């Protein structure tokens, strides 16, 4: 029997099958899901910003450039093989825009771009993503199957 494990904002969790990882409220944030399909272990990070920059200390799960290393380390501790890791992501919306004015800061785009940079650096293929738009998402990640269910208001639900 599976448990649903909630991942909060600027948080990350790892688990083994048959558990499900879930995060809600993905606007400009990214939900990045990484798993090993053979060992059936994986994790999810709810990333808020692209880089930690010069911010000392703080929460490494908040930033794409620091969360990815931590997420992979924790998944490997569960018995995953780095060579088998695969990723999926969702989120990265442009939540605040005003007619006739340029998008403010484009945090969603920058978050998605930085996650891709980090995945390439780590040698982890991104299998599929559901990013962009102007709507929020809630995601459920099955670490056993690798299925990522993406739910949105007014845009339906899909499994990627």
Curated annotation (Swiss-Prot):
InterPro entries assigned: CheD-like_sf (IPR038592), Chemorcpt_Glu_NH3ase_CheD (IPR005659), Cytotoxic_necrot_fac-like_cat (IPR011324)
Entry superkingdom: Bacteria
Major enzyme class: hydrolase
Entries under CDD domains matching the protein: CheD
Any Pfam family matching the protein: CheD
Key words, A-Z: Chemotaxis, Hydrolase
Molecular functions per Gene Ontology: protein-glutamine glutaminase activity
Catalytic reaction equation(s): L-glutaminyl-[protein] + H2O = L-glutamyl-[protein] + NH4(+)
GO process terms (BP): chemotaxis
Record EC number: 3.5.1.44
Keyword DNA repair (UniProt): no
Key word Hydrolase present: yes
Function description: Probably deamidates glutamine residues to glutamate on methyl-accepting chemotaxis receptors (MCPs), playing an important role in chemotaxis.
Family membership: Belongs to the CheD family.
Protein name per its UniProtKB record: Probable chemoreceptor glutamine deamidase CheD
Species name: Desulfitobacterium hafniense (strain Y51)
């Amino acid at each position: 029997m599976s448990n649903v494990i909630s991942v909060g904002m600027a948080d990350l969790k790892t688990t083994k099958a048959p558990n499900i990882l879930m995060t809600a409220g993905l606007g400009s944030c990214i939900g990045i899901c990484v798993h090993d399909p053979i060992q059936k272990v994986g994790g999810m990070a709810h990333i808020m910003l692209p880089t930690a920059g010069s911010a000392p200390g703080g929460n490494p799960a908040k930033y794409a450039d620091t969360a990815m290393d931590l997420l992979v380390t924790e998944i490997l501790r569960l018995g995953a093989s780095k060579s088998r890791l695969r990723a999926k992501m969702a989120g990265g919306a442009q939540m605040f825009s005003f007619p006739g004015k340029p998008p403010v800061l484009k945090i969603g785009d920058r978050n998605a771009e930085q996650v891709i940079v980090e995945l390439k650096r780590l040698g982890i293929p991104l299998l599929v993503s559901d990013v962009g738009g102007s709507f929020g998402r809630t995601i459920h990640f099955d670490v056993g199957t690798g299925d990522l269910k993406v739910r949105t208001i007014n845009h339906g639900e899909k499994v990627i």
